[in-house]
C-alpha cells in the first residue's frame, strides 16, 4: 500500500512526513521545497505563486502538471485524481485542507461528491492538529478512536437518516432527531462507534 501525502494551500502548521509519495497542490508545492521534502508531484494552476517560484517548482518536481485556471475541478480534486490514476490502492492524507479560503475548505469536506473520487473515499483522510476527517459509504460504518482526540462528529451527505451506537450519545429510532451535523459526541473507553447510514456517504 502506497502512502501519499498531499499538501494543499491552506494552513500547514502541523504535518507528518512518514509517506512514500509527496504531492504539492499549487502553493503547497513551494511549501514542500521550503521544508526540504520531496516533490514527487506538483499539480495546480499555480495562480498563487510568482513566476520565479513557479520556475523553481517546475525545475524541482519529478512530475509537473499545470492546469488552466478555468477548469471544473479544484486543484486538490485534480491532484487526487492524478494520484489515484497512478496509485489506485493508495492511502492519501491531505494536509492544508483547512484554514484558507472557505470555498476550498467546503470543497475538501465534500470530496466524495465528485463521482471520480467517490470510489476512493475510504482512502482519503484530511488532517491537521485538531481534526481528522474521514469518509464512509452508506451502510454500517465502524468508526475507530484517534489518539489524542476526544470528540467525534457525524454529518450525512444529503438527507439520509443515520443511527449511532456505542458512543456517549447514541441515536436510534427511540430518540431520533434530525440535524445536518451531530457534533460533540464522544468515544467511550476508546471503543469503536458504529454508525449506520441509509444512503449517500458519511463525513
Say what each PLM segment does:
Residues 1-56:
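N-terminal beta-strand-loop-alpha-helix module at the start
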Residues 1-2, 20, 88-91, 122:
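Short coil/turn segments at beta-strand junctions that form active-site/ligand-binding loops
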Residues 6-8, 26, 95-97, 127, ...:
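Short beta-strand segments
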Residues 23-25, 65-66, 125-128:
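General beta-strand structural signal in soluble alpha/beta enzymes
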Residues 29-31, 49-51, 73, 101, ...:
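Short gly/pro/ser/thr-enriched loop/turn and capping motifs at secondary-structure boundaries
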Residues 64-87:
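Short phosphate-binding loop-to-helix
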Residues 91-139:
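Anionic-ligand-binding alpha/beta catalytic cores of soluble enzymes and soluble regulatory domains
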Residues 129-131, 136-203:
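Long, charged alpha-helical interface segments
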Amino acid at each position: 500500500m502506497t502512502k501519499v501525502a498531499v499538501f494543499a494551500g491552506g494552513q500547514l502548521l502541523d504535518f507528518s512526513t512518514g509517506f512514500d509519495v509527496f504531492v504539492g497542490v499549487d502553493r503547497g508545492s513551494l511549501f514542500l521545497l521550503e521544508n526540504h521534502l520531496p516533490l514527487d508531484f506538483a499539480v495546480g494552476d499555480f495562480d498563487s505563486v510568482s513566476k520565479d517560484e513557479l520556475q523553481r517548482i517546475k525545475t524541482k518536481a519529478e512530475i509537473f502538471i499545470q492546469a488552466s485556471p478555468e477548469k471544473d475541478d479544484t486543484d486538490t480534486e485534480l491532484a487526487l485524481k492524478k494520484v489515484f490514476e497512478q496509485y489506485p490502492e493508495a492511502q492519501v492524507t491531505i494536509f492544508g485542507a483547512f484554514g484558507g479560503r472557505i470555498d476550498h475548505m467546503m470543497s475538501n469536506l465534500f470530496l466524495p461528491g465528485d463521482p471520480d473520487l467517490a470510489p476512493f473515499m475510504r482512502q482519503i483522510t484530511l488532517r491537521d492538529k485538531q481534526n481528522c476527517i474521514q469518509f464512509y459509504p452508506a451502510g454500517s460504518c465502524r468508526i475507530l478512536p484517534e489518539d489524542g482526540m476526544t470528540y467525534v462528529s457525524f454529518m450525512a451527505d444529503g438527507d439520509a437518516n443515520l443511527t449511532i451506537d456505542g458512543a456517549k450519545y447514541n441515536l436510534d429510532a427511540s430518540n431520533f432527531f434530525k440535524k445536518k451535523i451531530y457534533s460533540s459526541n464522544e468515544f467511550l473507553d476508546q471503543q469503536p462507534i458504529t454508525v449506520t447510514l441509509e444512503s449517500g456517504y458519511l463525513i
